[in-house]
Amino acid sequence: MIFNRLYYINKLISHKHNKMVKVVTGIRRSGKSFLLFELFYKHLIDNGIAEDHIITIALDDRLNKPLRNPDTCLAHILGLIKDKEMYYVMIDEVQLMDEFVDVLNSLLHIPNVDTYVTGSNSKFLSSDVMTEFRGRGDEIHVNPLSMSEICEAMSDVDWNHLWELYMTYGGLPMTIQFQTEKEKADYLKKLLSETYLKDIKERHNIVNDLELEQLMSIVASGIGSLTNPQKLSNAFLSSGKTKLSAQTIKQYLDYFCEAFLINKSERFDIKGKRYISTPYKFYFTDLGLRNAKLNFRQIEETHLMENAIYNELVMRDFNVDVGVVEIREKDEKNNSVRRQVEVDFVVNQGSKRYYIQSAFALSSIEKTQQETRPLINIPDSFKKIIVVKDDILLRRDQYGIVTMGLKQFLMDWNSLDL
């Protein structure tokens, strides 16, 4: 099964010849190498680029071990450049080369060379590769498969069934290829323990790995919940686990984020137009990895749907925060009181902004009021949207608030502008 990944291919195409090193980043096993060496390579060939003008180097291949030497690699590349036509250089797992920054910097000085690299492992995660090229690197971040990408490749399968699979096993390309649910689950659990967490432990010399594992379980169990290191430290104590300081927890959370396992969403005071430093929320980059950490015992569709909406927004290149709105209400004694209510997502991209609520169902008037109350009290005219699980016809209420179904939101790239 081939996933076309057209969004990322189009990104690579639009960034061609920009005199920068294109750095393809993302969680391990998200398909970075396939994107570059198969899909983008095919695009170049289909558009008339000769094979001998595409230089590919997979540094994780034992046969290419000599090319891990920077001078040998540079000489190899220069030896393949025979004319003044454009050459495309693609290097996979660039961190395996010593002094690779110098090599790529040398390539930047050659006018007819366009360079693309990937890099990720325990000693040099892809977030670090991008850091090395601040000012000279052009990041193209690859996420796990989106729901629409999966549906495109499996158009003969019922959408609701695919949603159940996606919600449970996520969107890592290899996971989709397995036929049985047991194979998917076993793969994810093994990948989490033997690749992602092992990378973090080796990279940061973590000896007491049980605490790291336990922290990830707590974060996985509480996706979409407001938290901070001190709260998580208290959770360790209350659950009878060993004491873990807030500072250590903060470090571990940073490690998870650096490895692209989780994303942190800051709180934003909508009326005050300022960020609130704590608490904040975490969402898993891949739902399958989240569920694997909990041994597939905590499949809560409400929270997983919220996480899926967050991931979709991030994939569409939006900046996503958690919103807070202060409102004045009357209490049971008719006294005026201030309350803070939450907007699930404050979504920004350039001059665009959207406010989005994830609501599994609007099953009663009270539930509808609960979801609309924060949106009604936002003092601006940016679009306000509620996403529900049911596949409904899009509708607008008297306040201009749009309610749409999850399927429409996930499947239509322009759903926020309908």
Positions of the model-derived regions?
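Conserved catalytic segments around the Walker B and adjacent sensor/switch elements
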Residues: 45-61
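Short glycine-rich substrate-engagement loop in P-loop NTPases that contacts/grips substrate
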Residues: 56-84
